[in-house]
Amino acid sequence: MATVAKINQANRKAKYPTRQYNRCKVCGRPRGYLRKFKMCRVCFRKLASEGQIPGVTKSSW
């Protein structure tokens, strides 16, 4: 889990735009971030399988 300090640091405006990076709004994870949903792949998969993200359905072909 991300520490509170790292989450707060990510929420602050960076001095330079290239220093800004995205963190999951649910758990604070910095990797596997999905911009459209503002969360990491792990939280996205969990919430999508529970049906808590509107408009997301499981793909099958």
Curated annotation (Swiss-Prot):
**GO MF terms held by the record:** rRNA binding; structural constituent of ribosome; zinc ion binding
Q: Its domain of life? A: Bacteria
Going by the UniProt record, its keywords in alphabetical order are:
Metal-binding, Ribonucleoprotein, Ribosomal protein, RNA-binding, rRNA-binding, Zinc
Checking SUPFAM superfamilies in the record gives:
Glucocorticoid receptor-like (DNA-binding domain)
Which Pfam families does the record associate with it?
Answer: Ribosomal_S14 (PF00253)
Q: Which positions are annotated as binding Zn(2+)?
A: 24, 27, 40, 43
Q: How is the cofactor bound?
A: Binds 1 zinc ion per subunit.
According to its UniProt entry, the protein's GO biological process terms are: translation
Query: What is the annotated role of this protein in its UniProt record?
Result: Binds 16S rRNA, required for the assembly of 30S particles and may also be responsible for determining the conformation of the 16S rRNA at the A site.
**What PANTHER family does UniProt report for this protein, alphabetically?**
30S RIBOSOMAL PROTEIN S14 (PTHR19836), SMALL RIBOSOMAL SUBUNIT PROTEIN US14M (PTHR19836:SF19)
Q: How does it assemble?
A: Part of the 30S ribosomal subunit. Contacts proteins S3 and S10.
Indicate what this protein is called per its UniProt record.
Small ribosomal subunit protein uS14
- Please spell out the taxonomic lineage of the organism that makes this protein: Bacteria, Pseudomonadati, Spirochaetota, Spirochaetia, Spirochaetales
Q: Which gene encodes it?
A: rpsZ
